[in-house]
């Protein structure tokens, strides 16, 4: 397979040009490994130019090594040819911790800046811990959204992050953030797939010019937070069979047609290639209609963030009922 060219989200005042498919690096239990670094390097060889990491995942060093090796091999001319997203974990989401935590992420990455820096969850836990799950007694009673965002804006002002955004924010929380943000969030990264289409959130993001980025596009089957609902869907299976595509490709193409950025996660080379083979065909109106009628169910509930001593007493509080 020749190196693929991945379409990009056009640059805007909020966001640098962003490849529409990114390679995720979260593997549970969270750990760095030579296997991860090798897979990321192979992904670069195949044409991937967008990599999604986080302090929690323990893979910032893997991204650093893969990008540095890709430059040494001439696969990319420089770090600037790669789009890197990272996220600040809840233990660093204290007003005075954001900038130091961003600098630590950059040290881990061996980079002067990230293209996109995200607030990982709208929640705060005791500083110094990067465990998940975490002891629920470490949950702070409130999430200082404005204080944290001012720190994110400072990261942007200092050039530590070319763009800033959020992850796992409901439509209501995103609107709350937009009400006071000086530097607006460029992106919101959330669970997204045909069985959890995020219709309400998508509407808000489109209206406000916030790029929607979707993780678990295939439902994350086999992980503690995923389900088999997507991969076991008879409707998606039938569409795939009719088109001569895989079920995974149907899911990814559907998200691509919605205008989303897709975050895929596989270290299998054949599936890496398959994930890039979605750009020269499209779903029919009838197929899109069938997908729109699929029953909806959230995979990642966020129950870890629900506790009596925190801001979210039930799952509905975390997601604001949406």
Curated annotation (Swiss-Prot):
UniProt-listed PROSITE patterns: ALDOKETO_REDUCTASE_1, ALDOKETO_REDUCTASE_2, ALDOKETO_REDUCTASE_3
GO cellular component annotations of the record: cytosol
An annotated Gene Ontology molecular function: aldose reductase (NADPH) activity
Catalytic site: 57
Record-listed NADP(+) binding positions: 216-275
Family annotation (InterPro entries): AKR (IPR020471), AKR4A/B (IPR044497), Aldo/ket_reductase_CS (IPR018170), NADP_OxRdtase_dom (IPR023210), NADP_OxRdtase_dom_sf (IPR036812)
Record's keyword annotation contains NAD: yes
Keywords: NAD, NADP, Oxidoreductase
Listed EC numbers: 1.-.-.-
Site keyed Lowers pKa of active site Tyr: positions: 87
Role noted for this protein: May play a role in auxin-induced cell growth by generating hydroxyl radicals, which tends to increase cell wall loosening.
PANTHER family: ALDO/KETO REDUCTASE (PTHR11732)
Recorded family membership: Belongs to the aldo/keto reductase family.
Name of the featured protein: Probable NAD(P)H-dependent oxidoreductase 2
Organism name: Oryza sativa subsp. japonica (Rice)
């Amino acid at each position: 397979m020749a190196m693929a060219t991945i379409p990009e989200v056009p640059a805007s005042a909020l966001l640098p040009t962003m490849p529409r498919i990114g390679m995720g690096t979260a593997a549970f239990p969270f750990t760095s490994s030579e296997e991860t670094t090798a897979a990321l390097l192979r992904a670069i060889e195949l044409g991937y130019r967008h990599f999604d990491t986080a302090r929690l995942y323990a893979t910032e060093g893997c991204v650093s090594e893969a990008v540095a090796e890709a430059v040494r091999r001439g696969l990319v001319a420089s770090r600037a040819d790669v789009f890197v997203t990272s996220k600040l974990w809840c233990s660093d989401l204290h007003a005075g911790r954001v900038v130091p935590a961003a600098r630590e992420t950059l040290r881990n990455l061996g980079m002067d800046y990230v293209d996109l820096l995200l607030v990982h969850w709208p929640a705060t836990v005791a500083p110094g811990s990067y465990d998940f799950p975490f002891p629920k007694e470490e949950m702070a009673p409130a999430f200082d959204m404005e204080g944290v965002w001012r720190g994110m804006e400072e990261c942007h002002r200092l050039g530590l992050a070319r763009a800033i955004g959020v992850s796992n924010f409901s439509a209501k929380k995103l609107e709350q953030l937009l009400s006071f943000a000086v530097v607006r969030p460029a992106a919101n990264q959330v669970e997204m797939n045909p069985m959890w289409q995020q219709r309400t959130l998508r509407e808000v993001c489109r209206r406000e010019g916030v790029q929607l980025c979707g993780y678990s596009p295939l439902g994350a089957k086999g992980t503690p937070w995923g389900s088999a609902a997507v991969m076991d869907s008879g409707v998606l299976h039938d569409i795939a069979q009719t088109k001569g595509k895989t079920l995974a490709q149907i899911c990814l193409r559907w998200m691509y047609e919605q205008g989303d950025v897709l975050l895929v996660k596989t270290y299998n080379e054949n599936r890496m290639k398959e994930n890039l083979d979605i750009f020269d065909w499209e779903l029919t109106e009838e197929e899109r209609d069938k997908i729109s009628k699929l029953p909806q169910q959230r995979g990642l509930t966020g129950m870890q963030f629900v506790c009596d001593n925190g801001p979210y007493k039930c799952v509905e509080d975390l997601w604001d009922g949406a």
